Amino acid sequence: MERTLSIVKPDGVERGLIGEVVRRLEKEGLKIIAMKMIHMTRAQAEGFYAVHRERPFFESLTTFMSSGPVVVMVLEGEDAILRYRTLMGATNYKDAAEGTIRRDFATEIERNVVHGSDAPDTAAFEIGYFFNSFEIMGR
């Protein structure tokens, strides 16, 4: 079984999309094995997105991600990373496939409702960033 991190971003929380995201995860057969709502500080957002520190969007991304509450979840399932990334859709919602979360709900590239890990190593780092082993209800 593979694990991945999901974040419902501040725009998704503000717009009341948590339930819709969870519904789609469960419909896809991805098991939620940890979940909590947090409000990241700017420093936490900068640490989480440190890999993008030199990118031109780093400042706006970390400001946005610390602008309101988010819901972080650990998902588990066969090929969980690929399945969740497919469910999310392309980062740029205009390029996302019909029926994906981002195509259906995003309003701009940064306010694209959800985040998901892109690889097993990334998932391990991201899950550990928000959860300790006692908070994860896996097998």
Curated annotation (Swiss-Prot):
Localization per record: Cytoplasm
A single GO molecular function term of this UniProt record: ATP binding
Pfam families: NDK
Requisite cofactors: Mg(2+)
GO cellular component: cytoplasm
GO biological process: one example: CTP biosynthetic process
Active site: 115
Enzyme Commission number(s) of this protein: 2.7.4.6
PROSITE patterns, alphabetized: NDPK, NDPK_LIKE
UniProt-annotated binding residues for ATP: 9, 57, 85, 91, 102, 112
Enzymatic class: transferase
Alphabetically ordered keywords of this record: ATP-binding, Cytoplasm, Kinase, Magnesium, Metal-binding, Nucleotide metabolism, Nucleotide-binding, Phosphoprotein, Transferase
Catalytic activity as recorded in UniProt: a 2'-deoxyribonucleoside 5'-diphosphate + ATP = a 2'-deoxyribonucleoside 5'-triphosphate + ADP; a ribonucleoside 5'-diphosphate + ATP = a ribonucleoside 5'-triphosphate + ADP
Similarity comment: Belongs to the NDK family.
Subunit field text: Homotetramer.
Function: Major role in the synthesis of nucleoside triphosphates other than ATP. The ATP gamma phosphate is transferred to the NDP beta phosphate via a ping-pong mechanism, using a phosphorylated active-site intermediate.
The name this protein goes by in its record: Nucleoside diphosphate kinase
